[in-house]
């Protein structure tokens, strides 16, 4: 069955180690997965594998961002402040 072998090979190329090396590596892999899925050239099984891997990467990125946000809260006295020009004016609001 050559088709099953092709699917297994494409699954292997889409499957990377479970944990990315960094946030940036996860984002780069996500961009690659999205581009390959948007091309419409992946077989159904490979698209499903890419979707699953993408979901894993999104979860990883969310966890990293949550950890960084927690660190910022600790460093900033548990009160997140908006960046200047985002949502409020630079003079402190209302």
Swiss-Prot record:
It catalyses: Exonucleolytic cleavage in either 5'- to 3'- or 3'- to 5'-direction to yield nucleoside 5'-phosphates. It is an enzyme of class 3 (hydrolase). Belongs to the XseB family. It is found in: Cytoplasm. Heterooligomer composed of large and small subunits. GO terms for biological process: DNA catabolic process. InterPro entries: Exonuc_VII_S, Exonuc_VII_ssu_sf. Its main location: cytoplasm. This is Exodeoxyribonuclease 7 small subunit. It holds the Pfam family Exonuc_VII_S. Bidirectionally degrades single-stranded DNA into large acid-insoluble oligonucleotides, which are then degraded further into small acid-soluble oligonucleotides. Gene3D superfamilies: Exonuclease VII, small subunit. GO terms for molecular function: exodeoxyribonuclease VII activity. GO terms for cellular component: cytosol; exodeoxyribonuclease VII complex.
């Amino acid at each position: 069955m050559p088709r099953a072998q092709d699917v297994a090979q494409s699954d292997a190329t889409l499957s990377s180690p479970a944990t990315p090396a960094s946030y940036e590596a996860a984002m780069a892999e996500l961009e690659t997965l999205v581009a390959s899925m948007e091309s419409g050239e992946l077989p159904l099984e490979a698209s499903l594998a890419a979707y699953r891997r993408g979901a894993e990467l999104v979860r990883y990125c969310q966890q990293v961002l949550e950890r960084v946000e927690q660190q910022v809260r600790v460093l900033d006295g548990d009160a997140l402040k908006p960046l200047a020009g985002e949502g409020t004016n630079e003079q402190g609001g209302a």
